[in-house]
């Protein structure tokens, strides 16, 4: 970066974003623990994976900062740890605010202040947050439809513990290979040739 961000709105926006991403990471780890308690290992895994991605976003924003103390005024979710459905809805709403409102505005300010690289970072991270929202909303829809462990057609279910793959409309109560509980099974694509895990 060529010019200093000290004293700019971009500096404040970076610190707000760093704080927001750091808090999201913590919330998602709390939500993962709750999902695991409720028997949703796959959803817990998605929360943990997303938490790690939020850490990387926080790191990206933090690295643009130049040190010292910066005072900011910002609002952050002061919510509770609900059940997994509530947590998915809250997470999706938070991701939506980031990609639809906050980061586009922060990118605009960065461009106006001459920080093109920072503007690009805000825009790129916003695209990731949009994907996070989609994933959370899909998981929530699956829960609402009672389709976390049961589908309308036969699909492949993979054990997160041992890798065993089972084909059927419903995940078995326990893995036939290692006997881990149903909570450890996640669905994969309906096509056996598609090795991508569905989200």
Where do the model's predicted regions map?
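Acidic/His metal-coordination segments adjacent to aromatic residues that form catalytic metal sites
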Residues: 2-13, 73-94
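Conserved alpha-helical segments that form or flank metal/cofactor-binding pockets of metalloenzymes
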Residues: 37, 42-74, 135-143
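Short functional micro-motifs and their immediate structural scaffolds
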Residues: 167, 180-184
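Short cysteine-rich clusters marking metal-coordination/redox-active sites
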Residues: 159, 175-178
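The feature marks the first
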Residues: 16-34, 38
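A broadly conserved sequence feature marking short terminus-proximal activation segments
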Residues: 105-165
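Conserved small/polar residues in nucleotide/adenosyl-binding loops
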Residues: 187-192
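Alpha-helical transition-metal enzyme core signature, strongest for iron centers
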Residues: 20-28, 47-62, 92-99, 122-136
């Amino acid at each position: 970066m060529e010019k200093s961000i000290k004293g700019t709105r971009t500096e404040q926006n970076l610190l707000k974003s760093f704080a927001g991403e750091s808090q999201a990471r913590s919330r998602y780890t709390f939500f993962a623990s709750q999902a695991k308690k409720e028997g949703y290992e796959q959803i817990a895994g998605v929360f943990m994976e997303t938490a790690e991605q939020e850490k990387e976003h926080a790191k990206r924003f933090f690295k643009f900062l130049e040190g010292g103390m910066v005072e900011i005024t910002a609002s952050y979710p002061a919510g509770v740890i609900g059940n997994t459905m509530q947590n998915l809805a809250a997470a999706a709403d938070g991701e939506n605010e980031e990609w639809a409102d906050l980061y586009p505005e922060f990118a605009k300010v960065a461009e106006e202040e001459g920080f093109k690289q920072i503007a690009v970072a805000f825009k790129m991270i916003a695209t990731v947050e949009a994907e996070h929202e989609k994933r959370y909303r899909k998981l929530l829809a699956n829960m609402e439809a009672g389709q976390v462990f049961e589908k309308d057609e036969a699909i492949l279910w993979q054990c997160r513990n041992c890798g065993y793959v089972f084909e059927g409309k419903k995940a078995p109560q326990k893995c036939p290979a290692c006997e881990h509980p149903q909570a450890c099974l996640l669905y994969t694509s309906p096509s056996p040739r598609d090795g991508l895990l569905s989200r």
